[in-house]
Regions:
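Transmembrane helix boundary and interhelical loop/hinge segments in multi-pass membrane proteins
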Residues: 83-104, 108-109, 116
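Membrane-interfacial segments
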Residues: 43-48, 93, 97, 137, ...
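Junction motif at the cytosolic side of a transmembrane helix
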Residues: 15, 240-262
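Aromatic- and glycine-rich beta-strand/loop motifs that create alpha-glucan
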Residues: 1-30
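Secretory targeting signals
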Residues: 21-22, 26-88, 112-180, 197-200, ...
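Alpha-helical transmembrane segments of multi-pass membrane transporters/permeases
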Residues: 184-193
Length: 262
């Protein structure tokens, strides 16, 4: 039984790594986003770390403290990760892939849990590494004014962890929605408009909209000292979204006829 689980775990990893979407997204989050973060920090250094709208008319708000610099850039990667989650979630239903996978592991419950676990761990690792590279690049761009890119600070490591949780939970949610609907379209229609400021627009006007997934996730990204206010609440409610949707996907998967899966 353990050998079957190990084989199934490796199979899931291979499918993720060799997916075309993974090959596209990884360069975005590992190379392009850190580069953007570096360029942004250079621009901040040119303006001045103490600049405010009063001293520089091009600024809308004051430059945030050093520990918060770089986190604005990771919103780009969040967009890419949500798309990746949606594609990975719907991937099993393409070209009868699901039926082929179940030949390796006929126990649908074990198959789903293994697949969900492997995907979640992969997503968290990618999220953490990407965000670290982006923040390290930003601090490197600040030259002597910045923190050591290797050591950073306790607060920055805490912010990186929160950002990684935000990315991971939103990406796994995107994955679960796509798995439930057997298509990436549901995830993209529900989550991407929220990333494009729709979530913030609604949250500013409707109290309940603050509990939309992307709004909760963005509350975990330390773009300014005003942002990280109730991280425990945000993680709790965002985790609840993931738990509920993934449970629906799980029970639907157990009951459906895989032969008619598409």
């Amino acid at each position: 039984m353990s050998s079957i689980k190990s084989h199934n775990t490796l199979s899931e990893l291979y499918k993720i790594f060799y997916s075309r979407s993974t090959k596209i997204v990884l360069p975005i989050v590992f190379i392009f986003q850190p580069l953007l973060s570096y360029i942004s920090s250079k621009q901040i250094l040119a303006v001045g770390l103490n600049a405010t709208p009063e001293t520089n008319s091009s600024l809308v708000e004051p430059i945030p403290p050093i520990e918060y610099i770089g986190f604005e850039a990771i919103l780009l990667g969040l967009f890419a990760m949500i798309i990746l989650g949606a594609i990975l979630g719907s991937m099993e239903y393409k070209n009868s892939s699901l039926r082929t996978s179940l030949l390796l592991c006929s126990n649908k419950a074990v198959f789903f849990v293994t697949k969900f676990f492997v995907t979640s761990v992969f997503i968290f690792i990618v999220s953490f590494v990407s965000i670290y590279l982006s923040i390290a690049s930003a601090q490197f761009g600040l030259e002597r004014e910045g923190l050591s890119p290797l050591i950073l600070s306790n607060n920055v490591w805490y912010f990186i962890l929160l950002g990684s949780l935000s990315w991971s939970l939103l990406t796994v949610l995107s994955y679960s929605i796509a798995f439930y609907f057997k298509s990436s379209l549901g995830s993209l229609l529900f989550l991407l408009p929220q990333v494009y400021n729709l979530g913030s627009f609604l949250a500013d006007r409707i109290q309940l909209a603050k509990y939309l997934p992307v709004s909760l996730g963005q509350d975990l990204i330390a773009t300014s000292p005003l942002k990280i206010t109730t991280p425990g609440r945000s993680v709790l409610f965002l985790s609840t979204w993931v738990l509920v949707i993934s449970s629906f996907a799980y029970y639907k998967f157990l009951k459906e006829d895989v032969g008619n899966g598409r």
